Regions:
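Short, Lys/Arg-enriched N-terminal segments with co-localized hydrophobic residues
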Residues: 26-42
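Gly/Ala-rich beta-loop-alpha elbow adjacent to hydrolase catalytic centers
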Residues: 104-113
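Short hydrophobic targeting helices and cationic amphipathic motifs
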Residues: 13-16, 27
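The alpha/beta-hydrolase serine catalytic core
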Residues: 120-241
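Active-site catalytic motif of lipid deacylating hydrolases and related acyltransferases
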Residues: 44-97, 216-217
């Protein structure tokens, strides 16, 4: 990696009341494996934050779980509340409760993840301007792309939601110091036609941890395997595969 310049990766890969809190997908809940009893204290934990109109039960979260399970990595993947005024307190409390070693985000999740300071974070195609995007995309009912734990099938984008995103976005990048710059990585698809905040990331975090990969906005298995997982393993100090 050349410091001070983006890395281009080529290859084959193209606080809410308790009753109101969304379910959290904890992908560590599997039968214990033989010989693992003494590893409990060394388990690593990832908090995965999904994109807009998605859920914790999406392909990237599931793949992280499957690929890292053998390394005793827990993946906590919440269904983020659709309203930003509810989502941010919910996520701050979740971080306090779960104490993740690493936060990995996709799209809208990067907006929230940027503000969860003090923890190493990987922001993949972060959507830092949700208010503007939703304003131009139009308001109305949207269907969730993935299964939600509460059974919800759709939700409404309205002026209140957009205003809440706009207020939240005012807090972006505040107080970013050298320590925060060292903790945060930005991964950007070279062919992302939906969202591209490379310049914003570089302005506030520099280019040392800015990675440009051969891909689009939505992640696929090849990109997760070739780009995301190697970085996650490195940051968690796991054996390279």
């Amino acid at each position: 990696m050349r410091k001070g310049a983006p890395l281009s990766c080529g290859g084959i890969f193209a606080c809410l009341p308790l009753r109101a809190r969304p379910k959290v997908h904890n992908f560590a809940q599997r039968p214990a494996r033989a010989g693992c009893d003494n590893k409990t204290n060394t388990m690593k934990k990832i908090l995965f934050l999904h994109g807009f109109a998605s859920s914790g039960h999406n392909g990237t979260a599931i793949m992280l779980r499957d690929q890292l399970y053998a390394d005793d990595v827990t993946v906590v993947a919440p269904d983020i509340p659709v309203m930003p005024a509810e989502a941010m307190p919910f996520l701050r409390q979740l971080v306090a409760d779960e104490k993740p070693d690493l936060i990995v985000t996709a799209s809208m999740g990067g907006l929230y993840g940027e503000m969860l300071r003090g923890i190493p974070r990987v922001l993949i195609n972060p959507a830092f301007s949700m208010a503007k995007r939703l304003t131009f995309d139009g308001m109305g009912h949207r269907e969730f792309y993935n299964k939600r734990e509460d059974g919800a099938k759709d939700f409404k984008v309205d002026r209140t939601m957009i205003d809440q995103f706009r207020e939240l976005e005012k807090q972006l990048f505040k107080g970013v110091d050298a320590a925060e710059k060292a903790r945060v990585w930005g991964l950007f698809g070279e062919h992302d036609k939906r969202v591209n905040h490379q310049k914003d990331f570089a302005k506030h975090y520099g280019k040392e941890h800015l990675v440009v990969f051969d891909g689009e906005h939505s992640l696929n298995g090849a990109v997760v395997s070739a780009v995301v997982l190697p970085l996650v393993r490195r940051l968690l100090e796991l054996p390279a595969h």
